[in-house]
């Protein structure tokens, strides 16, 4: 399964929007180096969340705010977990079909 393509038909895990702007947003918080990310390149697709354009922009803003960085990181990683639950459920449905 291509995780980036799969995101296109999904709703946003943060707000529920299904507005055609949902993408696999890559985690880029303070732990990004642990997940293969760094300056100039994205981390592993496994550490991504289905976010709409508005929620993606909100996460970008909060990650850049030093006062909110760790809280935003925890929230983003929660969204990644919700995305993985969705992916696992979809894979299970495909196997059952």
Each language-model region and where it sits:
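Short cysteine-rich loop/turn motifs with clustered Cys
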Residues: 1-28
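Histidine-centered catalytic micro-motifs
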Residues: 22-30, 49-59
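Polybasic, low-complexity binding patches
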Residues: 34-49, 57-97
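General secretory precursor processing signal
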Residues: 15-18, 55, 83
């Amino acid at each position: 399964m291509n995780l980036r393509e799969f995101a296109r038909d999904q709703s946003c895990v943060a707000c529920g929007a299904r507005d055609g702007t949902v993408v696999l947003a890559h985690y880029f918080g303070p732990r990004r180096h642990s997940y293969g990310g760094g300056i100039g390149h994205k981390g592993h697709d496994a550490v991504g969340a289905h976010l709409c354009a508005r929620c993606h922009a909100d996460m970008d803003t909060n990650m850049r705010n030093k006062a909110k960085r760790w809280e935003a990181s925890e929230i983003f990683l929660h969204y990644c977990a919700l995305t993985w639950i969705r992916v696992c459920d979809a894979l299970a449905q495909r196997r059952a079909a």
